[in-house]
């Protein structure tokens, strides 16, 4: 039986708190100045993935984060949700072929984005996409070694929690609240179990009560990473 986790209280070992520079305190222009000061010029790869179940505001949030970074004069590339381009069924009606297409398309999109900008922000990672496959077909050990290897390419993982209220209707994602929470719980379960429980990237879960400051918290958490940037596990393996 899968363990159910409360929405508002994520496992403490997954929640790495970051200092948030709030715009209400420093002003937007000072915030941009802070980002430019802490983020030195020069090319340095950084990939931040927003992970979570559907219908929680990830897509809106990635645009907000990219906007803040661009206004602070940084070269940023956005990877949008690839599932919307899938020719296969999605949501609870997904197929194994459809989920494999999404996983490969996600990786391909991230590779392309990394050629266009030193900073990449992604709407989802391969792991939360994998949750939909696990929900329908169970865990796939042969896939997980490959997925864990790719998960090492992310610099920072931002968990976006479910919020109270109905799922926004967009004509694409399922509006079934139980299905939404099942995917959320699966993501928590996978992050707490091998081979995904020892990823090099920190996982920061956002506070569901502080939606207005989410984008600023993400940027504040990402800024220090670029200063002492080190090659990712993926880069190290490629260099061997």
Describe the residue ranges of each PLM region.
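Conserved substrate/cofactor phosphate-moiety recognition/catalytic segment
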Residues: 67-105
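Hydrophobic anchor at the beta1->P-loop junction of P-loop NTPases
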Residues: 50
């Amino acid at each position: 039986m899968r363990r159910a986790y409360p929405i508002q209280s994520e496992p403490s070992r997954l929640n790495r708190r970051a200092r948030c520079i709030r715009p209400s305190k420093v002003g937007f222009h000072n915030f941009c100045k802070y980002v430019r000061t802490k983020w030195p010029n020069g090319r340095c790869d950084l990939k931040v993935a927003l992970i979570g179940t559907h219908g929680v505001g990830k897509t809106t949030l990635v645009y907000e984060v990219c906007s803040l970074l661009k206004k602070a004069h940084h070269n940023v590339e956005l990877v949008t949700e690839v599932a919307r381009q899938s020719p296969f069924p999605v949501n609870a009606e997904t197929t194994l072929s459809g989920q494999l297409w999404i996983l490969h398309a996600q990786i391909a999109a991230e590779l392309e984005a990394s050629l266009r900008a030193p900073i990449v922000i992604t709407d989802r990672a391969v792991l939360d996409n994998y949750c939909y496959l696990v929900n329908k077909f169970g865990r796939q050990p042969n896939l997980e070694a490959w997925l864990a290897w790719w998960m090492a390419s992310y610099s920072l993982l931002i968990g976006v929690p479910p919020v109270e209220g109905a799922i926004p209707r967009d004509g694409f994602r399922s509006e079934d609240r139980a299905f939404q929470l099942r995917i959320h719980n699966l993501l928590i379960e996978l992050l707490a179990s091998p081979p995904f429980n020892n990823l090099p990237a920190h996982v920061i879960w956002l506070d569901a009560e502080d939606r207005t400051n989410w984008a600023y918290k993400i940027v504040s958490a990402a800024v220090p990473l670029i200063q002492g940037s080190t090659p990712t596990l993926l880069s190290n393996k490629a260099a061997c």
